[in-house]
Swiss-Prot record:
The keyword Thylakoid applies. The lineage of its organism: Eukaryota, Viridiplantae, Streptophyta, Embryophyta, Tracheophyta. Belongs to the FKBP-type PPIase family. This is Peptidyl-prolyl cis-trans isomerase FKBP13, chloroplastic. The gene is FKBP13. Interacts in vitro with LTO1. The precursor, but not the mature form of the protein, interacts with the Rieske protein. GO terms for molecular function: peptidyl-prolyl cis-trans isomerase activity. Residues 109-208 form the PPIase FKBP-type domain. The keyword Nucleus does not apply. Coiled coil: none annotated. The interaction between FKBP and the Rieske protein probably occurs before they are imported into the thylakoid. One of its GO terms (cellular component) is thylakoid lumen. It comes from the Eukaryota.
Length: 208
């Protein structure tokens, strides 16, 4: 299965057979990303480590969701629908707790693990950590993920923090996600179209 460097992604060097990693935060420039890498404790898993930014021909930074051309071959095109009543914060970020956690909440700057399924508003799945068989490991609250994730997990603007073991659905407006640029764009088509509202089912596993 061939891999694809998306408009806001990063890849491993061409000599290494690893999937492109989807960018979670598209606001960092290359210098900032390298500086963040030097300060950050990175997982020993090579797929979650910083890759050579130039290999995808992009200047944005790393650590994020895994995408490849054949991703949807192994994941349902439509998400499983579950009734969920959303509470909406002033920022437009909405949440619904399907399972309230039992353990400690995340602390800003902490390395945590979370499983997730990402969907468009029409229910089409564009990414799933469950499909890859392992959770995403990232540092929360420092810009490694889109703003909607940081706010939706840490708690902000009237949204309570997630607790370890909790399962929450986030409905994220474009301004807290990928904005008017969209993501995963190539040849006039985008996996995440511009100005998309995104739905994420997140399972907060806890501290990494």
């Amino acid at each position: 299965m061939s891999s694809l460097g998306f408009s806001v992604g990063t890849c491993s060097p061409p000599s290494e057979k690893r999937k492109c990693r989807f960018l979670v935060n598209n606001s960092l420039n290359k210098a900032e990303a390298i500086n963040l890498r030097n300060k950050q404790k990175v997982s020993s898993d090579p797929e979650l480590s910083f890759a050579q930014l130039s290999s995808c021909g992009r200047r944005e930074a790393i650590i994020g969701f895994g995408f490849s051309i054949g991703l949807l071959d192994n994941v349902s095109a439509l998400a499983e629908t579950t009734s969920c009543e959303f509470s909406v914060s002033p920022s437009g970020l909405a949440f619904c707790d399907k399972v309230v956690g039992y353990g400690p909440e995340a602390v800003k700057g902490q390395l945590i693990k979370a499983h997730y399924v990402g969907k468009l508003e029409n229910g089409k799945v564009f990414d799933s950590s469950y499909n890859r068989g392992k959770p995403l490991t990232f540092r929360i609250g420092v810009g490694e993920v889109i703003k909607g994730w940081d706010q939706g997990i840490l708690g902000s603007d009237g949204i309570p923090p997630m607790l370890t073991g909790g399962k929450r659905t986030l409905r994220i407006p474009p301004e807290l996600a990928y904005g008017d640029r969209g993501a995963g764009c190539k040849g006039g088509s985008c996996l995440i179209p511009p100005a998309s509202v995104l739905l994420f089912d997140i399972e907060y596993i806890g501290k990494a």
